[in-house]
């Protein structure tokens, strides 16, 4: 025991990396962050205290520089950092051959689906949920905007991934296991497996019903067709997993990002007013709000980018990699040591951003802005860039523009604070918005 303590304190290759004392012996930072539900903010506190590289466990480092981001996730990252044994590896197959086969199929199929059905499915889902919530029919009736956003994004996700509308029972049960998986017991088991054995943990097969729905054009069917055209044998469970990931990416992450965007707009009425003015000039009716037009609106896209910066959906720890023996920011990381870059800390670092804690979409369109935009790259870069990036931007543009075009908003739960009242593990949840929604044009409800 004494020898082990001496090794951990003085002889371990990571012994000189700053961090909490207990992190030399146990993953105390992860335990603390999961127990408190403040992972996003705790990572930033650690980096504010110890600097740009922090030891957060016996064999885990967290970085907070854009140069570390380039090194770990950039074009050459795969040569020095592995998915094997990492948390990121838990999200999909780690088999290199399957990844090589599947990635171009997923990227191509998503882009084709986006072009063919993205806007249509988004409008259908929004119209149905606006109607079911009776939005705008009684101006004084409070509406849970966060619940409304959650439900139409769940429906859109189900249509895009598997061609069905989904139901409320499925919405609850499908993601209970994911959120439970981020609970203390499940997370510590995952950490123990990855830390002790450094072995990949393959997800079990997702149990999807065969597609018997009114939306036959969906990711699952397109992946099947693409695999058939290229004569590739892709196991069914891998097709299902990628559909599940799309579903979770839309419902499990985009809904909170959308709620965060509206939170900051409602808390900054000058930003909401400027966005209203920009969107109202797109067309004479809501039917003219095509994504081709919305993509050209600088302030709308700036609001989306600013939300990605100030309130990232995921903590960087979910993008963990395992070093094969590499140097990051002048620090040698021995083989087997896990590394990640914290997105929230990067997005709030004053060395990269002027007034980093202020919601300021103007920074993204100001030609004289001195901010370093490399410090906010929510979709990663290079070969590992998220294939759903275009779909995410389209979805946000359509949803935000349509609601802002049709309705005026008044925030009711003004005492809600996004930092104080939300829960953040590796995934940020719990943004609550109660509003009244008044039609801008009497009788024009959008459904």
Swiss-Prot record:
Q: Report whether Oxidoreductase shows up as a keyword of the record.
A: yes
Q: What is its EC number?
A: 1.-.-.-
What family does this chain come from, according to its entry? Belongs to the cytochrome P450 family.
Give the UniProt keywords, A-Z.
Answer: Heme, Iron, Metal-binding, Monooxygenase, Oxidoreductase
Which molecular function GO terms apply here? Answer: heme binding; iron ion binding; monooxygenase activity; oxidoreductase activity, acting on paired donors, with incorporation or reduction of molecular oxygen
Highest taxon of the lineage: Eukaryota
Pathway note: Secondary metabolite biosynthesis
* Residues bound to heme: 386
Q: What does this gene product do?
A: Cytochrome P450 monooxygenase; part of the gene cluster that mediates the biosynthesis of aurasperone B, a dimeric gamma-naphthopyrone. The first step in the biosynthesis of aurasperone B is the production of gamma-naphthopyrone precursor YWA1 by the non-reducing polyketide synthase albA, via condensation of one acetyl-CoA starter unit with 6 malonyl-CoA units.
Report, from the record, the phenotype seen after gene disruption.
Answer: Leads to the accumulation of the monomeric compounds fonsecin B and flavasperone.
Which reaction does this chain catalyze?
2 fonsecin B + NADPH + O2 + H(+) = aurasperone B + NADP(+) + 2 H2O; 2 rubrofusarin B + NADPH + O2 + H(+) = aurasperone A + NADP(+) + 2 H2O
Q: Which Pfam families match?
A: p450
Extract the InterPro entries matched here: Cyt_P450 (IPR001128), Cyt_P450_E_grp-I (IPR002401), Cyt_P450_sf (IPR036396), Cytochrome_P450_monoxygenase (IPR050121)
Cofactor dependency: heme
- Protein known as: Cytochrome P450 monooxygenase aunB
């Amino acid at each position: 025991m004494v020898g082990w303590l001496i090794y951990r304190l003085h002889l371990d290759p990571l012994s000189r990396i700053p961090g909490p004392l207990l992190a030399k012996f146990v993953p105390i930072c992860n335990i603390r962050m999961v127990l408190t539900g403040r992972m996003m903010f705790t990572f930033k506190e650690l980096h504010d205290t110890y600097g740009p590289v922090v030891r957060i466990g016996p064999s885990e480092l967290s970085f907070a520089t854009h140069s570390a981001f380039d090194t770990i996730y950039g074009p050459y990252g795969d040569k020095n950092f592995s998915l094997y044994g990492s948390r990121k590896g838990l999200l999909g197959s780690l088999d290199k051959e399957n990844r090589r086969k599947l990635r171009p199929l997923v990227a191509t199929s998503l882009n084709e689906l986006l072009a063919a059905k993205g806007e249509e499915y988004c409008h259908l889902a929004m119209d149905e949920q606006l109607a079911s919530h009776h939005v705008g029919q009684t101006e004084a009736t409070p509406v849970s905007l966060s619940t409304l956003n959650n439900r139409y994004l769940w429906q859109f996700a189900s249509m895009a991934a598997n061609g069905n509308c989904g139901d409320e029972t499925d919405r609850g049960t499908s993601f209970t296991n994911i959120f439970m998986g981020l609970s203390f017991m499940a997370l510590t088991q995952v950490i123990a497996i990855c830390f002790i054995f450094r072995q990949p943990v393959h997800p079990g097969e997702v149990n999807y019903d065969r597609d018997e729905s009114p939306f036959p054009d969906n990711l699952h069917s397109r992946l099947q067709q693409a695999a058939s055209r290229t004569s590739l044998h892709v196991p069914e469970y891998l097709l299902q997993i990628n559909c599940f990931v799309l579903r979770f990416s839309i419902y499990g992450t985009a809904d909170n990002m959308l709620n965060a965007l509206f939170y900051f707009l409602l808390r900054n009425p000058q930003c909401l007013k400027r966005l209203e003015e920009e969107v109202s000039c797109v067309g004479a009716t809501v039917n003219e709000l095509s994504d081709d037009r919305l993509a050209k609106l600088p302030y709308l896209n700036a609001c989306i980018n600013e939300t990605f910066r100030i309130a990232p959906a995921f903590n960087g720890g979910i993008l963990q990699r395992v070093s094969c023996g590499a140097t990051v920011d002048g620090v040698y990381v021995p083989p087997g040591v896990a590394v990640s870059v914290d997105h929230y800390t990067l997005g709030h670092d004053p060395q990269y951003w002027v007034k980093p804690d202020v919601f300021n979409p103007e920074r993204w369109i100001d030609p004289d802005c001195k901010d370093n935009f490399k410090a906010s790259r929510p979709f990663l870069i290079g070969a590992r860039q998220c294939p759903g990036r275009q779909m995410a931007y389209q979805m946000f543009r359509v949803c935000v523009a349509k609601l802002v075009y049709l309705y005026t908003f008044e925030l009711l739960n003004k005492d809600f604070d996004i930092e104080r009242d939300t829960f953040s593990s590796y995934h940020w949840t719990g943004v609550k918005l109660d509003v009244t929604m008044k039609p801008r044009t009497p009788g024009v409800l959008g459904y």
